[in-house]
Amino acid sequence: MGSSQEEGLPCQPSQPDHDTGGHGGPDLEGAGRVSTTPGPPGLLTSHPPADSDDTDATGPPAALLEGLLLGDGKPSPHSTRPGPFFYIGGNNGAAIISSYCKSKGWRRIQDSRREDYVLKWCEVKSRDSYGSFREGEQLLYQLPNNKLLTTKIGLLSTLRGRAWAMSKASKAPGGTQARLGKDATAPTLEDLPWTSPGHLRPQRVLRMEEFFPETYRLDLKHEREAFFTLFDETQIWICKPTASNQGKGIFLLRNQEEVAALQAKTRRAEDDPIHHKSPFRGPQARVVQRYIQNPLLLDGRKFDVRSYLLIACTTPYMIFFSHGYARLTLSLYDPHSSDLSGHLTNQFMQKKSPLYVLLKEDTVWSMERLNRYINTTFWKARGLPKDWVFTTLTKRMQQIMAHCFLAAKSKLECKLGYFDLIGCDFLIDDNFKVWLLEMNSNPALHTNCEVLKEVIPGVVIETLDLALETFQKSLRGQKMLPLLSQRRFVLLHNGEADVWPRLGGSCSLRRRLPPPTRQAKSSGPPTPRAPDQPGTRRPVPPPLAPQRPQLPGPSPDPDSAHDGQPQAPGTGDRHPEQEPSPGTAKEEREEPENARPWGGHPRPTPHAPATLPAFRDL
């Protein structure tokens, strides 16, 4: 999960979360498909491919980006310099991304210090990249503080914070909905039932312990002492560094001797004076997590499922789900084995086996193949619904991913141009219960087997398409839906109905915001207004928090807005894998206690010349 690097600190390039062994250069497989995938009209597709892979010429990215985005793909007539430019740091998916950008006439630059790019995709987050980022003019991959979701401790703390907030709200008079001002009749994602073998039960609140294994932090004394006290040899626990990937630094705890050794090691580290003087030189923080000893097996082998959470836009939030693939071990599962390759499914671990060269195609299954196997092997024997993978499993993964995002939403840094693709790993136990293992920044985008060649390029291309289209619509002040570039991704959360400003946001663009979903009562009907036309500008009082860009238009109907409800394109003829998950997450319409609605005051018009000087001068 995640990366071991701290932002702004000298470090080696991070590795994708798995599947990098043996890769010394850019992955060329699958890259040829990029140019054949049509993008939506007007999304930077009119340029012929550039011949050069690098250039030393410079050009104003704001003018170029506005000319391309707002001029339906045509370069700005005010700029005669080469460009626009893109930068890729690292090899993970570089060939696919580069081919995509070149097909739009963009030119690749190799100097990471240059600031005249329109797209920057890096494996390693850099403080300088965020410091020089020009909001509304550039696209930058990875949210600055995505570690809230993509490190072990970050995700654990985020989920605990959500659980605490929901517990506190539920104790208020009238329950959670009364405290949070909810419409008790509105359908919610977590009000609807979900299917498990043999029974159907309502799931009113998604509780952390139902999808996330019991976990303790070893960097906190009271938590590690609690773990050392409760451990017994009937259990297996797995110890993980908080920010490593590829299975590095992971080991199992199965007996008192191993736990005693870990206890002594943590005490030595705590007593080390260097650790107290310089926390950066201390050992990396770790967690211990209850190991799921009864995983569902495919022909006797352990597997997990990689899915994707896409944050295509942060102003407003546009959050999507996409299927990925199943990852299997080469060896048969033995809970007592000390060989980690039988416990960890990622490709980096499987490549260590001498059998990998011969059997690598059988270590990655498509979701369609997994669905066929479940139908054939377990459908009738375990009383599962038909196509369990594309119905129950899909909906459950969407529920969990939406819950995790909502838990972090108010704390994530959001600027127009930030986007992120996060790999989410799920394990299914032999009772068909779905567990979230971890969420990964910089998910592996290599295509070293046939299934990955079919899955990865499509995921990357649609990620970039959706990031560009949502950026364009937010910049123009247009409504987000429908999205012409949405194909396989399923919409989990449409933030157009969110109450602004958000906590944790740092957006400086000042554009018109829609009224909040819950409006104050008035004696007369609201004044009608064309959906894409700004209202009359009047003086605005000083905001209580930084103003956030959002789209113009009338107040969204809470019964029809897609706030948290997965929406797939072409719902009239939907593949089972695009089955939307039910309802809107109950917490999704929450707002932090100190986040205030605009209270009826008019908001700024869509254009803000003072904050976009390059656009003003055109």
Curated annotation (Swiss-Prot):
Its cofactor is Mg(2+). Mg(2+) 1 binds at residues 425, 438. Residues 539-557 have a biased composition (Pro residues). It is an enzyme of class 6 (ligase). The record marks 246 as: Essential for specifying elongation versus initiation step of the polyglycylase activity. GO terms for molecular function: ATP binding; metal ion binding; protein-glycine ligase activity; protein-glycine ligase activity, elongating. It is found in: Cytoplasm, Cytoskeleton; Cell projection, Cilium; Cytoplasm, Cytoskeleton, Cilium axoneme. The keyword Ribosomal protein does not apply. Keywords: ATP-binding, Cell projection, Cilium, Cytoplasm, Cytoskeleton, Ligase, Magnesium, Metal-binding, Microtubule, Nucleotide-binding. Residues 1-76, 503-618 are annotated as: Disordered. A protein binds at residue 246. Its main location: cytoplasm. Residues 57-74 have a biased composition (Low complexity). Its EC number is 6.3.2.-. It comes from the Eukaryota. InterPro entries: TTL/TTLL_fam, TTLL10. GO terms for biological process: protein polyglycylation. ATP binds at residues 240, 246-247, 289-292, 302-304, 345-346. Mg(2+) 2 binds at residues 438, 440. Residues 585-594 have a biased composition (Basic and acidic residues). PANTHER family: INACTIVE POLYGLYCYLASE TTLL10 (PTHR46810:SF1). Polyglycylase which modifies both tubulin and non-tubulin proteins, generating polyglycine side chains of variable lengths on the gamma-carboxyl groups of specific glutamate residues of target proteins. Involved in the elongation step rather than the initiation step of the polyglycylation reaction. Polyglycylates alpha-tubulin and beta-tubulin. Polyglycylates non-tubulin proteins such as nucleosome assembly protein NAP1. This is Protein polyglycylase TTLL10. It comes from Macaca fascicularis (Crab-eating macaque). The lineage of its organism: Eukaryota, Metazoa, Chordata, Craniata, Vertebrata.
